[in-house]
Amino acid sequence: MSNVPPPSGLSYQVKKKLEGKRDKDQENEALEWIEALTGLKLDRSKLYEDILKDGTVLCKLMNSIKPGCIKKINENATMPFKIMENISAFLEAMKGYGVPVADLFQTVDLFEKKDIAQVTRTLFALGRTCQTHPEYSGPVLGPKLATENKREFTEQQLREGQNVVSLQYGSNKGASQAGINMGKQRMIMD
């Protein structure tokens, strides 16, 4: 990360757009949830991304949700490959727990601070997934996942649906913008 030059041009605009997607309230809510589950007291004087960057807090979070799912945590890691190993172990444990792959962040999103908002969205996805596991009794993070509401119709109900008169569907004859011209007409030959 130290040899990466500061972004300029289009990269700078992309970085600013990604930073604009961050929500400090959600980040604080995620940190409170982590503290409640792990029992850790996180250093809130640090930046959100710096608290999570080495991956140890995330690994401890996953082990508190599903004990023993991450066997090796590289504590106090300073070497980049050890830090990335922690983050990768966390992501693999989340996949195994049932978090959809589409909701996971990439290792570089956290390690190189590329997309911190995606890291927060991943934590909220983990919170939603926890609520689907009956053995989970911890605090809630984010909304509950929707459950399937399958409908069963009898053959008679399906036949009755075919008897609906087309006039009951509604009308497609109403106000439209056909024929409306705004401003002066364009004259090709004046």
From Swiss-Prot:
Gene3D superfamilies: Calponin-like domain. Residues 24-130 form the Calponin-homology (CH) domain. PROSITE patterns: CALPONIN_1 (PS01052), CALPONIN_2 (PS51122), CH (PS50021). Muscle specific. One of its GO terms (molecular function) is actin filament binding. It holds the Pfam family Calponin. Calponin-like repeats lie at residues 165-189. Residues 1-23 are annotated as: Disordered. GO terms for cellular component: actin cytoskeleton. GO terms for biological process: actin filament organization. It comes from the Eukaryota. Belongs to the calponin family. This is Myophilin.
